[in-house]
Amino acid sequence: MAVIAVIDYDMGNLHSACKGLENAGATPKITDSARDIEQADAIVLPGVGSFDPAVYHLRSRDLEAPLKDAIASGKPFLGICLGLQILFDASEEGSQPGLGIISGVVRRFRSEPGLTIPHMGWNQLEYTQANLPLWQELPFNPYVYFVHSYYVDPIDPSVRAATVTHGSQKVTAAIAKDNIMAVQFHPEKSSSNGLKILSNFVNQIRVKAIA
């Protein structure tokens, strides 16, 4: 079974993500060890909370360089929620620089009449990379579960893999570039659609291992 390093940096409950990966047929390993990251078949970076504490905790544990090295090596990577946002250069939420792996910034939803912030609950994805392996065998415009007040705004629009509309604002819900995949929603809370997304990620790891 594929061993997936699930990065522990004190930003949320990792066990629901691990359970989803186990159900998808992988062996998740919660870790903050550079050696584990290097030896794993793939990496999952979950996270809930605020941008500045997240990047602070990653850097205080000396995890920035191992993560960047693993991604640069081509290792499959899945970011979830805050684990998507900290891939970017900066956030309107804080002052700390992000990891800068994807060019762009994290923005807050604009206030508008009747709009609830945070965006919380079930909403539909619209694919912008319809043939992405992560979306295989999912229904058209599937419902997934969101909890966020901020969204990523990549400089290169081609990295967008899906969008979501909240009020009048259509924003990035997922990105994909080479071996990097990351989603704003919570697949581990998204019922059968979320489990399928995690299964598709695990299948990507198997395909890479065979290749």
Curated annotation (Swiss-Prot):
It comes from the Bacteria. Pfam families: GATase. Its EC number is 4.3.2.10, 3.5.1.2. GO terms for biological process: L-histidine biosynthetic process. Signal peptide: none annotated. InterPro entries: Class_I_gatase-like, GATASE, Imidazole-glycPsynth_HisH. Residues 3-211 form the Glutamine amidotransferase type-1 domain. Keywords: Amino-acid biosynthesis, Cytoplasm, Glutamine amidotransferase, Histidine biosynthesis, Hydrolase, Lyase. SUPFAM superfamilies: Class I glutamine amidotransferase-like. One of its GO terms (molecular function) is imidazoleglycerol-phosphate synthase activity. Transmembrane segments: none annotated. One of its GO terms (cellular component) is cytoplasm. Pathway: Amino-acid biosynthesis; L-histidine biosynthesis; L-histidine from 5-phospho-alpha-D-ribose 1-diphosphate: step 5/9. It is found in: Cytoplasm. Gene3D superfamilies: 3.40.50.880. NCBIfam families: IMP_synth_hisH. HAMAP family: HisH. Heterodimer of HisH and HisF. This is Imidazole glycerol phosphate synthase subunit HisH. The gene is hisH.
